[in-house]
Amino acid sequence: MAAPPARPDHTRLLHICLLLGVLVEIRAEQIRYSVFEEQEEGSVVGNIAKDLGLAPRELAERGVRIVSRGRTQLFALNPRSGTLVTAGRIDREELCDRSPNCVTNLEILLEDTVKILRVEVEIIDVNDNPPSFGTEQREIKVAENENPGTRFPLPEAFDPDVGVNSLQGYQLNSNGYFSLDVQSGADGIKYPELVLERALDREEEAVHHLVLTAFDGGDPVRSGTARILIILVDTNDNAPVFTQPEYHVSVHENVPVGTLLLTVKATDPDEGANGDVTYSFRKVRDKISQLFQLNSLSGDITILGDLDYEDSGFYDIDVEAHDGPGLRARSKVLVTVLDENDNAPEVTVTSLTSSVQETSSPGTVIALFNVHDSDSGGNGLVTCSIPDNLPFTLEKTYGNYYRLLTHRTLDREEVSEYNITVTATDQGTPPLSTETHISLQVMDINDNPPTFPHASYSAYVPENNPRGASILSMTAQDPDSGDNARITYSLAEDTFQGAPLSSYVSINSNTGILYALRSFDYEQFRDLQLLVTASDSGDPPLSSNVSLSLFVLDQNDNVPEILYPTFPTDDSTGVELAPRSADSGYLVTKVVAVDRDSGQNAWLSYRLLKSSEPGLFAVGLHTGEVRTARALLDRDALKQSLVVVVQDHGQPPLSATVTLTVAVADSIPDVLADLGSLKPSADPDDSGLTLYLVVSVAAVSCVFLAFVTVLLALKLRRWHKSRLLHAEGSRLSGVPASHFVGVDGVRAFLQTYSHEVSLTADSRKSHLIFSQPSYADTLISLESCEKSEPLLITQDLLETKGDPNLQQAPPNTDWRFSQAQRPGTSGSQNGDDTGTWPNNQFDTEMLQAMILASASEAADGSSTLGGGAGTMGLSARYGPQFTLQHVPDYRQNVYIPGSNATLTNAAGKRDGKAPAGGNGNKKKSGKKEKK
């Protein structure tokens, strides 16, 4: 890179000349203004724009501004008007102190021409400060014996203003003792002096108050003042003097310690130590110093000890006063003590009995005491008294002795202890009295038996209470005390239901709390009568009895018990018959239940919980009658399953359910064609049923597989033109036939030949279940066939299928059940009031077994219903005369809502037919009703 060419020297010289020219021009251009101090902010100092010959708007264009530095900016440039104004209040005294000339400089820069303008502003003083003294008050001490003409310097005033506004002179207020003289120093400062004109007397006037005034020459004139206190210093030229030569005072005896007796006073006109007077006792005796005290500064005489008139009634005290230098004065204080009734009577008990039996006779001496008063005259006369409401009296014997006696017989139950206050009062003014307290205990005797607050008690206990439960707390009161009031509780011995009462309840002998020793059952007993005895421990003991009725409250703790229909022992359900010709409202059967509870807990309601055919049957809410809700149709399934729930109204409610199987057919043979419910073999070693089931399942499976194979072959023949379907068919040849259940035509086959094997834990009791086949001569729809349930066939029935002689015979159309022949509780036929229920579950099971046995005989056609051996007497027992009756004694507790009857031994009416006569369990067979 080439080096830059060197500048010629004449260029540098040109710059220096220009700079010098600017400096010369700057010095030449200087502006001077003046302004008074204490002007408001924004006050105009001068017009910069006018002095520079510029228009106001050119100031901003040319960049005119103040560049002064180093101190607070006092001025500002108004850019609109071009004037120089004050930036705040200006204090000349703060800025220039006492300098006679106060000038401040500032510089203004013109940026376009780089010119600096120098401006001087003179601050003109105003009289804004008055003369002031350093202190508002000055004290000057002058001895009272000072000679006239003596000078005393006074404080100087200061005025920060200058010139004529500064301090000009002093003035002193007029007085008869002092004058003012002002001296001027070489520096021009004036010094004021105080001059004593005549002799002083402190006792005449101790302090002189003067006012010194300083003033300036401003307009208006300002001034300042200072207070001058001339304090005269005393000399000891006077002795103390008492206000009285003798002081007389009277005081009552026994005044409190510290009481002010009187104040002695001595005066001394001197001041300070010369006038400070102190007091003291003169010729002090020990007795005086113990009873009286003199304050050495104030002269107060106070009581230091107890004054007693009996000791001394008069005191003579010498008092002395002296000032600081030692001048003294003397006086006397004469004290008279006044007598007062200051002694209260004294009571001394010489004999006292602290306790007395409540049976003591009137006039028994309780105490003997003496009274004494150390005062004399009326102050020593004493009278004694006791409260009027007490059963005691005072008797004065001799001298000042008194006896305290009983006035009547005492009763400890009314008042067990007496606090007797004996008051002894003298006749002084004011009277003084003394109280003595005598405590007397009244000893108890056993004269009150325990009492119960109630004549009898009743307690209510819910049944099923836990053993040891608290039933009731019984409390007896005995107004006696001690052992006479210690009560024990017991139960009177008795028996209930052959057992002692002590096995049912017990009572705490100390607290009277009754406890249950067993869990009560409302169904066993409902109330218990007890006799509670309360005995005290006195000698002899006293006692009282009170009766207690214990009522057991019923709880809903018994589930409704279904009496009919009963549950068979083989876990199957009973079968009820409903003819297909039955209309709406036909009584199929009746559910009968009882509840061992009472009240609402035994109020039962019936409702249909579940039905295989909704809307076909209805159950009476309060009667339990199962009736048809509509007429039976041919499409209705042969077997209908109903679940009836029986619920009480307890809290919480309890319920029981029963499952009813209703066979829809006109006669039993119609039912037995497809329905069987026989008792399984009881032989546990018999395995024939299991083998038979296995063989049957295998045979049916083979037939089903063959059918599916044939059906598949027909389908493949129809689709043989399709190679794809042919290939799929060859792959399906090894698939089990059960995969093709959904093929058309199989559904009808399955309806006819489908089967189900129910294997329970005991395979010998397993059932083979067949669905009812569809016959061409029956009018059962496909839907009803699908809804029908499988029928149970036990092993005994299956074994008969192998015998050709045991084939089902045609049903006998005469063997039909009428409405009156159905088992029920309220009489499904015309019965008498003496008909009975089955005595137990065994009878009900026997009834179902006979129905099934008869159905088996009807199936093989080997017997009739004439009551022979083969029928087990079905026609004789399964008729109107065999009605169910509930035997237990709690039937009368059952209330059937909706009727006025209760469950009794009489059979209810049904279907509006009158009952037939009969006795005991032997009933005449009713006529069969034909539909």
Curated annotation (Swiss-Prot):
In which broad location class does this protein mainly occur, judging by the first location in its UniProt entry? membrane
Known InterPro entries for this protein? Cadherin-like_dom (IPR002126), Cadherin-like_sf (IPR015919), Cadherin_C (IPR032455), Cadherin_CBD (IPR031904), Cadherin_CS (IPR020894), Cadherin_N (IPR013164), Protocadherin/Cadherin-CA (IPR050174)
Residue ranges with Basic residues bias: 921-931
Classify the protein's membrane topology as the record does.
Answer: Single-pass type I membrane protein
The residues on the Extracellular side of the membrane are 29-692
Single GO term (MF): calcium ion binding
According to the record, the residues making up region (Disordered) are 801-840, 901-931
**Matches recorded under SUPFAM superfamilies:** Cadherin-like
Task: Please identify the protein, giving its name as recorded.
Answer: Protocadherin gamma-A4
Gene name linked to the record = PCDHGA4
